[in-house]
Structures are given as structure tokens and as C-alpha cells.
Regions:
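N-terminal secretory signal peptides
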Residues: 1-21
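N-terminal export leaders
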Residues: 18-35
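Early extracytoplasmic/lumenal segment of secretory-pathway proteins
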Residues: 47-113
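Extracytoplasmic ligand-binding site segments that recognize negatively charged/polar headgroups
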Residues: 58-62, 105-111, 115-248
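A bilobed periplasmic-binding-protein/Venus flytrap-type ligand-binding module shared by bacterial periplasmic
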Residues: 161-168, 202-203, 291-305, 324-327
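Periplasmic-binding protein-like
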Residues: 223-233, 274-298
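Mature extracytoplasmic/periplasmic domains
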Residues: 296-366
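Conserved C-terminal helix/tail region of periplasmic/extracytoplasmic solute-binding proteins
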Residues: 359-392
Length: 392
């Protein structure tokens, strides 16, 4: 199965801002990390307003938030957190983030660390009735709970694999093509351990019988095995490059400098709009699954905003937010309330397109997936190894 036969559920996308693109912007200056320091103290904000500090991918724009507020009774003041888990955790632990923001949105994996340090609070599911509509497998994501309590409300889910040009490589179904010597110089991976390490680990575990237990959370020995494999292939000039950011990733495919690479699904749709026969591969080894969770910051509880924060989390699952986010980003909020909302508001959203996006994501998760972890136990070792690869 490929996406070639699937009609484009993103035909009305107004923005292809990706979940990692904000990291690029942060690299241009300190603005993404310093933005909170210029804000008013939380006590000066409107009583019915929630400061939502999350990846830019979760933003639905001023018009979207206006409708959201009218329907939910919660006014959202959105601030981009830069998307990189490291600085976000640092600002919560040692900075002023908990003094300013109420609710966060972040790649799954940091919840355990934040909960253990008392920086976030557990959700009371009794105050989030729409939680019952969340797809069951999304509720079971291990990152979302700690000591039996839910700290992350699943807000966006997807699963990544490979972008391929059919006229160059035909139909591919294994990550092995990324490391195939016949394609030396025509493959690529992302310059980010959070994605490239797990892709490689998934391949080695399933196709090379490597002794790897959990590709998303490698032991020191497992990580060494994976990184030595990548470094060897880099030295052998297997990869055209380790790409960085949306624009470079898209250009590599659009210019056909790279024929197959691991990457983000929206690149496929953007490349198709440029006339390329491009598809998203279905790897026999399994997908890299990821999630954005909504987290309740401890500062909001201390300020008496817990009830309003729960109202926000419930509204994320009510249908409008999922429809709007799907239209803007092509990512799915894991609830069938999206389809019900689109059906009731067919002038604003195409019910068929909303359903198609949901079914497309569900189909991925019906197969083999391995969860990305934004904060594996050895994350500092990951950083060290990745720098070694860059220098190789």
C-alpha cells in the first residue's frame, strides 16, 4: 500500500508548517526561547484566558482560536515553545515558564521526568468527558501516564516513514533502501537523533536481527550499535546529506537530488503539488509513531486555573479543533468527534476529507509501530553520539 492512490486530504491546507520547523527559527536567534520573558505576569492576564505554550504546529491561527473561544468558553493565548524538548524542560525546571504558562503541548516522552520533578500535574479525566472518545490505542501510549495517572492528553498522533520517488526507486517497503549501496549518494536522513536513530534501530531490529529491545529508548550498548552503523555509512558516503528543516527536505526531493529518504509526510503532498510522482512508503519493519500531548503545568494549578485548563483539554477533543488542525497541518486529533463535527458543519469542513484523514492515520497504527521518545533514558548519550556523527 502506498499513498499514491489516496486522494489528498490536505488539498485545502493553508500552511505546511511542520512540528520541527520552529526549531529552525529558534536557531536564528533567541526569540523562540525568550518570548515568555517579555510577557505580563500571569496574574495580569484575563481570568478566562489560558496561556497555551506549545509547538507551533498546534496553533490554529487567530481566526481559529476565535471560533474555539466562542464554542468552548476558553480564550487561548498561544505561544510557540520552539518544539525542542530540551529547552522546554529547562525553562520549566529552572526558568519562569511555570510562572507564565498554564498548559503545554509537547512531543511525548517528557511527561515522566516533568511529573517526577513536580513541574506538571495529573489530569482529572472526570473533568474531560471527551476523553472517552479518544481512540483506545492512543490512550494506551506509554508516554502519557506515570504511576497510574494520566499526565498527557493525546492531542495529535501520526506515524512517519520514507518519502520515495516512484520513477527512481519503484515501490519500496523497507528502510534497507536507505542503506543500499546501489543508491549511494541518493538517500538521506534528518539531522536529528529523535527521528533518525529510531528509524535505524527499527531497521536493524527487524531486518538485521540486531538485539534491540525498544527502538525508541535504546540502552547504551544498543545506541552504540546503531550509531556505529550510521557513522560507517556516512563515512562510506551513503547519504546525500543529513537534512535540516522543512525547506531543505522538500528541495532535496523536489530537485530529485535524493530519491528516497526518511522524513515527514507533508513533504509528500508538497512534492506532489510540484508534479512529482512521490509517495509515502509502508515499511515492513514498522512506522515511527509520535504524539503531541497536552500537559497541565503546575503553575496553573497553583493559580486556581485547573478547571479552566481542563475545559481547554476537553475542547481540544470536541471536534472543531481536530477539523481545523487537520485542514491546516494534515495531522489528526485522535477522536471520531472530528468527523461528527464536520458532518454537522459541512459548510466549514468537508466530512469526507476529515474522515479520510482519520482513516489514513488509523490504518498506519493498525500495523507495526514503534514510539518515538523525545526524552529517552540515555538522552544525553544520544546527544553525544549525534555530535560524533556530525563530526565524522
Amino acid at each position: 500500500m502506498t499513498l499514491n492512490g489516496l486522494s489528498n486530504p490536505l488539498s485545502r491546507i493553508r500552511s505546511l508548517l511542520t512540528r520541527r520547523q520552529l526549531v529552525q527559527r529558534a536557531a536564528l536567534g533567541a526569540g523562540a526561547l525568550a518570548v515568555g520573558t517579555l510577557r505580563l505576569p500571569r496574574a495580569a492576564q484575563a481570568a478566562n484566558e489560558i496561556n497555551f505554550w506549545a509547538s507551533g504546529t498546534l496553533d490554529i491561527g487567530d481566526d481559529g482560536w476565535k471560533i474555539f473561544a466562542n464554542e468552548s468558553g476558553v480564550k487561548v493565548d498561544f505561544t510557540d515553545n520552539g518544539n525542542d524538548p530540551g529547552p522546554v524542560v529547562a525553562r520549566l525546571a529552572a526558568g519562569n515558564a511555570n510562572d507564565i504558562y498554564d498548559v503545554g503541548g509537547l512531543d511525548g516522552g517528557t511527561e515522566k521526568e516533568l511529573a517526577k520533578r513536580g513541574l506538571i500535574a495529573p489530569w482529572d479525566l472526570g473533568q474531560i468527558p471527551n476523553y472517552s472518545s479518544v481512540w483506545e490505542w492512543a490512550k494506551d501510549i506509554p508516554h502519557s501516564t506515570f504511576e497510574g495517572r494520566v499526565y498527557g492528553i493525546p492531542t495529535v498522533v501520526n506515524a512517519d516513514s520514507m518519502i520515495a520517488l516512484r520513477n527512481r526507486v519503484g515501490t519500496v517497503d523497507s528502510y534497507g533502501v536507505i542503506f543500499d549501496r546501489k543508491l549511494r549518494g541518493k538517500t538521506a536522513m534528518e539531522d536529528a537523533w529523535i527521528n533518525s536513530v529510531i528509524f535505524t534501530a527499527i531497521y536493524l531490529k527487524n531486518s538485521e536481527n540486531a538485539k534491540i529491545s525498544e527502538p525508541g529508548d535504546l540502552t547504551a550498548d544498543e545506541l552504540g550499535l546503531v550509531m556505529e552503523f550510521l557513522i560507517k555509512h556516512k563515512k562510506d558516503r551513503q547519504f546525500r546529506t543529513f537534512w535540516n528543516g522543512w525547506e531543505q527536505g522538500l528541495q532535496l526531493v523536489a530537485n530529485q537530488e535524493v530519491w528516497v529518504m526518511t522524513g515527514w509526510e507533508p513533504i509528500v503532498y508538497a512534492a506532489r503539488r510540484r508534479g512529482l510522482d512521490c509517495y509515502y512508503a509502508v515499511p515492513k519493519e514498522g512506522y515511527e509513531a509520535w504524539i503531541y500531548n497536552t500537559i497541565l503545568l503546575k503553575g496553573a494549578v497553583d493559580r486556581g486555573l485547573s478547571m479552566k485548563a481542563h475545559q481547554l483539554a476537553n475542547a481540544f477533543l470536541s471536534g472543531f479543533y481536530g477539523c481545523k488542525l487537520g485542514m491546516l497541518r494534515g495531522y489528526a486529533v485522535p477522536t471520531d468527534n472530528n468527523v461528527a463535527y464536520a458532518t454537522a458543519h459541512a459548510r466549514a469542513f468537508d466530512p469526507a476529507a476529515v474522515k479520510e484523514l482519520s482513516e489514513h492515520v488509523k490504518a498506519k497504527f493498525a500495523g507495526k509501530v514503534y514510539w518515538q521518545n523525545a526524552r529517552p533514558a540515555n538522552f544525553q548519550l544520544y546527544e553525544q553520539w549525534w555530535q560524533r556523527l556530525r563530526n565524522a
